[in-house]
Amino acid sequence: MSLNFLDFEQPIAELEAKIDSLTAVSRQDEKLDINIDEEVHRLREKSVELTRKIFADLGAWQIAQLARHPQRPYTLDYVRLAFDEFDELAGDRAYADDKAIVGGIARLDGRPVMIIGHQKGRETKEKIRRNFGMPAPEGYRKALRLMQMAERFKMPIITFIDTPGAYPGVGAEERGQSEAIARNLREMSRLGVPVVCTVIGEGGSGGALAIGVGDKVNMLQYSTYSVISPEGCASILWKSADKAPLAAEAMGIIAPRLKELKLIDSIIPEPLGGAHRNPEAMAASLKAQLLTDLADLDVLSTEDLKNRRYQRLMSYGYA
């Protein structure tokens, strides 16, 4: 699969295009009287060094673009790469099955866990079917049903957050979007099993929080977590979405800032160039963090889990 490069990655894209061109020539005529392999190797090293240099100094807006990268791994990619025996469960038992939320039982190193996450979709038809990862109330009610099932069977809950936000359509509001989100916040704070949440892409507002109340909250290195998109913030404060880069910096949407504010617990490093460059390596790092988190939580009693979660929530907003 060829990589899609973002605007700030154009110098890397140019180098990679040269590498691809030389590689194609080499395949067409193996009798060329020049050492193409040596030149390709030199360019690859230069590309890696350039990538390292660019990614060492990314701003919040550039990270926001990476969080939305169309080739970035989604929930079902991590399910495939890091878990075994996934059985998807569907429907909220009241209205419909929202494809923007996926969930089911799987095994993490042999241990049964409940997985719940946003799913955006790749191709146009799938994006529409999954509503671009923006859940309706039935999606959050499905998530709550699966959480309650996990509690009943004493299974840890693992959530993957990747949404621009809850769907703001008229139908969603009529079916109780705000109530569904609020109920999830309340019920997640009361769950008697370990809950580990990880932001894998965009963590957009209440749509993210509705599956984001946990004992451990992680973020991938190039993910974002915010109350509104940078474009939305810029439109409100500066009356222009063009100010999105300025808004992104001011909002503190990136993992290091959120860890500094004690809103998250861990930052999971991504492969050089982002998770989409090496999904397998990213999944391995994510899996290792999940296993570490569950080991830390396994020693706590049900009451300890609830009390710690309550104290965590009550600490928000204090300097």
Swiss-Prot record:
Keywords: ATP-binding, Cytoplasm, Fatty acid biosynthesis, Fatty acid metabolism, Lipid biosynthesis, Lipid metabolism, Nucleotide-binding, Transferase
Keyword Transmembrane: no
Location in the cell: Cytoplasm
Protein name: Acetyl-coenzyme A carboxylase carboxyl transferase subunit alpha
Known EC number: 2.1.3.15
Gene3D superfamilies: 2-enoyl-CoA Hydratase, Chain A, domain 1
Homology family: Belongs to the AccA family.
Pathway in which the depicted protein is active: Lipid metabolism; malonyl-CoA biosynthesis; malonyl-CoA from acetyl-CoA: step 1/1
Biological process per Gene Ontology, one example term: fatty acid biosynthetic process
Domain CoA carboxyltransferase C-terminal, first and last residues per copy: 35-296
Xref: InterPro entries: Acetyl_CoA_COase_a_su, ClpP/crotonase-like_dom_sf, COA_CT_C
GO cellular component entries: acetyl-CoA carboxylase complex
Catalysed reactions, semicolon-separated: N(6)-carboxybiotinyl-L-lysyl-[protein] + acetyl-CoA = N(6)-biotinyl-L-lysyl-[protein] + malonyl-CoA
The encoding gene: accA
Cytoplasm in keyword set: yes
GO molecular function (one): acetyl-CoA carboxylase activity
